[in-house]
């Protein structure tokens, strides 16, 4: 019988080599185009290999396996691969979504002269995520973690001629540097107290792990997954091209923080206060983001805040000590969120770059395929039955209501679920119904290069939910006495929110609100939160640093060039004069002899 673990390791290494080779070939000169390997074909090959690895893993009785590639003696910086349920499933999903995005990029970025370079950056972005997922050592995890932050800056600020894009890229990398501080804190603790960076050693010595590495991982996840307080960079990242937004929000960087906590959950769950911290962060993020999405009119900003809200749900689920359920929602969210962004980019392209949903209507008549897929994605986001979002959100709400957590957290998450259904329906009705604003749109034709990847993601958004519900490991033992009201809670919230949204939209259309509306006040309040983190806090830090700098300057003038300096220069002279013995006869005789000699020289010479 062949060594199946060795085959799995070989397949994973082959996938990385194929991606790296394809990325390098994109930089070959045009004269060597025949030698280049199309990134889309490379993604197809790697995706098929990943499916093969999943089938092989099912045949192995062990839940996970570790394979070492390189084992130096210093600090145990082993390049080892972790092959388990989480890594194999998520790598396959990331490859499938990236392949669809690369196909979409050919149409969306067709006029960009650096299309090959852009594709290479997308591949490197994916490779860094795969390295982070598959690593069984903190060192390669740190390399993948940091590379994701760097690639996010390069991709978000791709249109560097625009000030907003450059500023958003800098904002993203600065917030990610804060997350890196947390990861490096855990990294340094492992070197100092364990003399090893191996994850198996870290888990084996769980009783010795203090609050420092736990705090570092929480800080890292909070920054990378844009939790409340460190969230402003995620909506700002919408200034990048649509393929970047789709890949960033679905299967790469923003999911890395939650994935870190899922992978480290066996040791994190033993720490007192960890569950409460995750629940607080997740509930606050979900409620704030869903509330903010209600007030937005920019299409991509609404989708960005919806991602933020779902990340809060995942974080709260980790806090409920259900990592499998959080991972399931992470995977389900990836499909419909990538499809939603690609549809938004297609709709905006058809409207000559317009992103304000108040200026969109009747797109179902203009782009029927894209509009239908967009409707499917919004329904999946709202948790409509038998779509991907339903299978995970229904279980999350059911788990929340059956758990013994504080009802404040449960209420915040349930209100966030209602808000999600409301802004999802608002987007759908605003964009798809009504009469098109532009007559030219009636002749618009959807490009197959654009619609094919969207339709593939739509099919995945329909099928994968039921597949996951069959093959996901058990989350908990089902309770036989579960009340029907709890079982139908998610479905009830979805339909209640839908009816409420339709009523509010009809009310707004029939009776427009005055200029000084509650919505404007709420928007201003939301902006003030960003001002606190970006203005007030920074102003106080600058004032404190300025005060310190002035104190240092004053001390310098006082000690180096002021009274202290004069005092220091006079002390040696005074010390020399104070060493005289006070013998007046001796001094007078020396003076007299010197005077006689000088007088003799002056008279006779």
Curated annotation (Swiss-Prot):
The principal location of this protein is: mitochondrion
Look up the record and give one Gene Ontology term from the biological process aspect: ATP synthesis coupled electron transport
User: Which Gene Ontology cellular component annotation is one that this UniProt entry carries?
Assistant: mitochondrial inner membrane
Membrane spanning stretches: 11-31, 49-69, 77-97, 120-140, 141-161, 178-198, 202-222, 244-264, 273-295, 302-322, 325-345, 371-391, 408-425, 457-477, 488-508, 584-604
Location comes to:
Mitochondrion inner membrane
GO MF terms on file?
A: NADH dehydrogenase (ubiquinone) activity
- Which EC number applies? 7.1.1.2
Q: Which reaction does it catalyse?
A: a ubiquinone + NADH + 5 H(+)(in) = a ubiquinol + NAD(+) + 4 H(+)(out)
The entry's keywords = Electron transport, Membrane, Mitochondrion, Mitochondrion inner membrane, NAD, Respiratory chain, Translocase, Transmembrane, Transmembrane helix, Transport, Ubiquinone
The membrane topology term of the UniProt record is: Multi-pass membrane protein
* Keyword Translocase applies: yes
* Family the UniProt entry places it in: Belongs to the complex I subunit 5 family.
Give the protein's function: Core subunit of the mitochondrial membrane respiratory chain NADH dehydrogenase (Complex I) that is believed to belong to the minimal assembly required for catalysis. Complex I functions in the transfer of electrons from NADH to the respiratory chain. The immediate electron acceptor for the enzyme is believed to be ubiquinone.
Q: What is this protein called?
A: NADH-ubiquinone oxidoreductase chain 5
